[in-house]
Amino acid sequence: MKLTHVLIVAVLVLTVCHLTMAVCKSGGQACWFLLKKHNCCSGYCIVAVCAG
């Protein structure tokens, strides 16, 4: 059960990361709200969103 939960969480994190990158590339609004930064499409910001 624990391994299954870990896999589910990993998939969710990757999905959120992918969606966040898509939003950042299209307009950048989501990342600005999350991190209060304007340069939301930089690699650092994407990593921070994925990790956060």
From Swiss-Prot:
Protein name per the record: Conotoxin Cal6.25
Coiled coil regions, renumbered to chain: none
One MF term in the entry's GO annotations: toxin activity
One GO cellular component term: extracellular region
Superkingdom of the source species: Eukaryota
Keywords on record: Disulfide bond, Knottin, Neurotoxin, Secreted, Signal, Toxin
Comment block on domains: The cysteine framework is VI/VII (C-C-CC-C-C).
UniProt KW Secreted keyword: yes
